[in-house]
Amino acid sequence: MTIAVAVKRLAHGAGLPLPDYATAGSAGLDLLAAVDAPVVIAPGARALVPTGLAIALPPDFELQVRPRSGLALKHGIVIPNSPGTIDSDYRGEIQVIVLNAGTEAFEVTRGMRIAQAVLAPVSRLVWQETDDLDRTAREAGGFGSTGLDFPMGN
C-alpha cells in the first residue's frame, strides 16, 4: 500500500535527496541531517537535528521517528522520545532529538542518515467510563511483575 504525502523542502534542505527506503522491504524511510556545519554531540548530551523538510500527512496517519539500529549499536546514538510522533496537523519542520548515550563524541554531518520514519495509521479512542473493569490474571501487576525469565512449559 502506498500513501501520498505532500512534502516541502526548506531552504537549508536544498540539495539533499528526499527520504527514501534503503531496500524494497524497509519499513522506514531514512531521514537525513540538514545541518550546514558538523554538529558534535558529547557523551550524555542531546542535539536537535533538522531534516530540512515539512510535510502534510493525510488525516488518520502519523509519522513515527525512530532510531537507526546501526547508530545505536555502534555509537550509542538514540532517540530519547522514540518513537517521536509527527501528527497529521503539524506543518513545521521535522526535527530529530538525538541523544549520545555512547562514550565518545559523535559528529553529525550534512546528509547523514540520522533516523528513520515509519508511516502509521492512527486509531482514535472513545472513553467509556465505568466503575468496574474486567478481571485478568495479571490485574495491576506491572513494572517487571512478570519477571525476566520466559516460563518454560513441560
From Swiss-Prot:
Top-tier EC class: hydrolase
UniProt binding sites for substrate: 68-70, 81, 85-87
Alphabetical UniProt keywords: Hydrolase, Magnesium, Metal-binding, Nucleotide metabolism
Catalytic activity as recorded in UniProt: dUTP + H2O = dUMP + diphosphate + H(+)
GO biological process, one term: dUTP catabolic process
Highest taxon above the source species: Bacteria
Involved pathway(s): Pyrimidine metabolism; dUMP biosynthesis; dUMP from dCTP (dUTP route): step 2/2
Keyword 4Fe-4S (UniProt): no
MF annotations from Gene Ontology: dUTP diphosphatase activity; magnesium ion binding
InterPro entries cross-referenced by the UniProt entry: dUTPase, dUTPase-like, dUTPase-like_sf, dUTPase_trimeric
Keyword check for Metal-binding: yes
Pfam family, one: dUTPase
Cofactor: Mg(2+)
Function summary: This enzyme is involved in nucleotide metabolism: it produces dUMP, the immediate precursor of thymidine nucleotides and it decreases the intracellular concentration of dUTP so that uracil cannot be incorporated into DNA.
PANTHER family: DEOXYURIDINE 5'-TRIPHOSPHATE NUCLEOTIDOHYDROLASE
Membership in a protein family: Belongs to the dUTPase family.
NCBIfam families, per the entry: dut, PRK00601.1
Stated name of the protein: Deoxyuridine 5'-triphosphate nucleotidohydrolase
High-level lineage: Bacteria, Pseudomonadati, Pseudomonadota, Alphaproteobacteria, Acetobacterales
